[in-house]
Amino acid sequence: MDSVIFLSWTIVLSCELSSDTGFPLPDTIHTFIHRKVLIKIMNIAICDDEILFTRELSSLLTHWAKKNDFSLTLYPYSNGDDLLTALRTIPVDLIFLDIIMPLLNGIDTAREIRSMGLTVPVIFLTSSREFALDSYDVKAFHYLLKPVNTLKLFSVMDDFF
């Protein structure tokens, strides 16, 4: 039995030998299509000026990824300018973005991301509720308060996938 992976679909083919010939014939072909992603790969950018928080979030995301059979690559950035520069060359599937940062705040960073034509989902992380309404203007996927509740984070990640 052979299988072919096409995008995220697995197609399994099997055939039997023909009884009256000496070579394989497709007398019986069974095609099964399974919606199953064999390797789930995710690239996530984390933009936060607090290094300890970035490490904590990275650890939580790594734990979530292992639990859900994802291969995870994390790209940490300490400010919005560095993130914007990187997004020109590094494709990401999801961005975690702090709001209160030096140089360029998270809302303005998200505005720039959208002006670049990128539709990548953004999850804001901040210690303040005051920017929640502004996050809708830049089409945020979610808004989480610091310190991050692990169960809430995992729930948001589950909703994303």
Where are these regions (language model features)?
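CheY-like receiver
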Residues: 84-161
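Two-component/phosphorelay signaling modules centered on CheY-like receiver
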Residues: 50-75, 115
